[in-house]
């Protein structure tokens, strides 16, 4: 399938420019993927919506030990340390799903939170926003790029095989910038 033409981590010989936003959007539209409230997109890493995050019983059934809320302080997101208690580790990121919102300052802290959590045996991480399509997906893509050494294209394909995602254009631009920084593209 599409994976055959995508180089595996460490196989890329030289830095390549990030695909255009339109090409990335086509990649995001390709194929079929789940539209569930929550999906496991990487081992023990889930993307979900606010309804799932606000349902402590559902989180317990899933075995979620860590929650990253990409819509912290938002109208529909109740989460926080007081809401989850001591049974769940929580990180809130006050991102707005707007193309001009700069989410990139949160890439590193979000990716590090996910990475640290996934090194704990038995840990499971839920990354959510309101719908689980743009903000949360953006932070998961950044994690896959920063800690799993996937290119942006590889990260999108990996997540899209398991969940329908569609980061807004501003977030895609910021992910492209991260991809270029990580791959050394665009430097003289």
Curated annotation (Swiss-Prot):
Protein name as it appears in the record? Dual specificity protein phosphatase 13A
Q: Which GO terms describe its cellular component?
A: cytoplasm
Please provide the record's keywords in A-Z order. Cytoplasm, Hydrolase, Protein phosphatase
Identify the InterPro entries for this entry: Atypical_DUSP_subfamA, Dual-sp_phosphatase_cat-dom, Prot-tyrosine_phosphatase-like, Tyr_Pase_AS, Tyr_Pase_cat, Tyr_Pase_dom, TYR_PHOSPHATASE_DUAL_dom
Q: Into which family does the record put it?
A: Belongs to the protein-tyrosine phosphatase family. Non-receptor class dual specificity subfamily.
For this protein, the record's Pfam families field holds: DSPc
Catalysed reaction, written as an equation: O-phospho-L-tyrosyl-[protein] + H2O = L-tyrosyl-[protein] + phosphate; O-phospho-L-seryl-[protein] + H2O = L-seryl-[protein] + phosphate; O-phospho-L-threonyl-[protein] + H2O = L-threonyl-[protein] + phosphate
Native source species = Mus musculus (Mouse)
Q: Chief location of this protein?
A: cytoplasm
What tissue expression does the UniProt record report for this protein?
Answer: Skeletal muscle-specific.
Q: What does this protein do?
A: Probable protein tyrosine phosphatase. Has phosphatase activity with synthetic substrates. Has a phosphatase activity-independent regulatory role in MAP3K5/ASK1-mediated apoptosis, preventing MAP3K5/ASK1 inhibition by AKT1. Shows no phosphatase activity on MAPK1/ERK2, MAPK8/JNK, MAPK14/p38 and MAP3K5/ASK1.
Active-site residues (renumbered): 129
PROSITE patterns hit by this protein: TYR_PHOSPHATASE_1, TYR_PHOSPHATASE_2, TYR_PHOSPHATASE_DUAL
Its taxonomic placement starts with: Eukaryota, Metazoa, Chordata, Craniata, Vertebrata
What's the subunit arrangement here?
A: Monomer. Interacts with MAP3K5/ASK1; may compete with AKT1 preventing MAP3K5/ASK1 phosphorylation by AKT1.
Source organism, top-level taxon: Eukaryota
Q: Where in the cell is it found?
A: Cytoplasm
GO MF terms, alphabetically ordered = protein serine/threonine phosphatase activity; protein tyrosine phosphatase activity; protein tyrosine/serine/threonine phosphatase activity
Q: What EC number(s) does its UniProt record assign?
A: 3.1.3.16, 3.1.3.48
Q: Where is the Tyrosine-protein phosphatase domain?
A: 37-184
